[in-house]
């Protein structure tokens, strides 16, 4: 696994249980993506600044300059955006596991018995192409 620096935006959302609420949340997150994208791009272009800060503040003795920068949302309640967003949205219960690389969005496997194949869907579930295999 590649070492990562996470850049996150936190969102406190009301719990929504209807289609209109899901649409509103999704539309809001599409707007939030723009801000998170700017943060991610800034960090990618300024890893040296973060490196110097970490050396000064925490006396780290390793380089983060080759680390991957991953943008994520931290959220208080599940939302439809989690399944199809450009960035992963992690509920409070999953943040630690995700950062420690002990949990990730699962690959959903569906068996197509007619054609004797397995269809695999990965995050974002409705945007990514289906992976077809004969496992």
Regions picked out by a protein language model, each given a short descriptive name:
Residues 2-135:
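Intrinsically disordered, low-complexity Ser/Thr/Pro/Gly-rich regulatory segments
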